[in-house]
Amino acid sequence: MSFSLSRLVVALGAGLLACAAQAAEVQVAVAANFTAPMKDIASQFEKDTGHKVITSFGPTGGFYSQIQNGAPFEVFLAADDTTPEKLEKEGGTVAGSRFTYAVGKLVLWSAKPGYVDDQGAVLKKNAFKHLSIANPKTAPYGAAAVQVLAKLGLTEATKSKLVEGASIAQAHQFVATGNAELGFVALSQVYKDGKLTGGSGWNVPGDLYEPIRQDAVILTKGKDNPAAQALVDYLKGPKATEVIKAYGYGLQ
């Protein structure tokens, strides 16, 4: 091997080692409603940065308990703003890292085309057998659904028909599989690029429920992980925010 060729091999090897050293993994807990956009964002983030994202999807309340019990998550994308704030007050986050990455929207949805009208009158007709919602105690979208029913004066009328999913993902699954005729789900689960991906739905007016501000935060376990900070920065950037808007979320 010539001297110049050997130097080239050494240089290439050093470059590969440098890239490997800079690339890192980040463990991320993600609210179930943000599953589809996060998969898109994580894929693009990995291509753009070389970092690897290990995601877990589920209910925000469940993640809070896991984090309290020492789960290895480094970044938390919640379905509300109160849970990350609570962790922040408890000293479980990196100071100054919390921000609102999306503002969620609620939709009354059915897998059946034409079943839900664009004013939500199907709720007052009360001709359905099952109405799916996420557990309001652990899932912010479930809490929002309860608020809507209360504002419409339908709490008692629908009480016996409620089917609770452990998360907004399960609440959506109940409707998608026909186990419930309709349900309150996250708009992001049934919406892409300006239209519903199937079925029929009513975009619930924002004055019927408290704003669903969804905050992200770096947890203390991610304090020294460059991939954790890189992901949070990426979520604020143009590529991620375009994905977030495409799934029907608002931005703050």
Curated annotation (Swiss-Prot):
Protein name: Molybdate-binding protein ModA
Molecular-function GO terms, alphabetical: metal ion binding; molybdate ion binding
InterPro entries in the cross-refs: AvModA-like_subst-bd (IPR044084), ModA (IPR005950), ModA/WtpA (IPR050682)
Function of the protein: Involved in the transport of molybdenum into the cell.
First-listed, main subcellular location of the protein, grouped into a coarse class: periplasm
Subcellular location: Periplasm
Signal peptide: 1-23
UniProt organism field: Azotobacter vinelandii
The organism's taxonomic lineage, starting at the top: Bacteria, Pseudomonadati, Pseudomonadota, Gammaproteobacteria, Pseudomonadales
PANTHER family noted in UniProt: MOLYBDATE-BINDING PERIPLASMIC PROTEIN, TUNGSTATE_MOLYBDATE_CHROMATE-BINDING PROTEIN MODA
Protein's GO biological process: molybdate ion transport
Record note on quaternary structure: The complex is composed of two ATP-binding proteins (ModC), two transmembrane proteins (ModB) and a solute-binding protein (ModA).
Record-stated family: Belongs to the bacterial solute-binding protein ModA family.
Keywords, sorted A to Z: Metal-binding, Molybdenum, Periplasm, Signal, Transport, Tungsten
Residues reported in the UniProt entry to bind molybdate: 60, 168
GO cellular component: periplasmic space
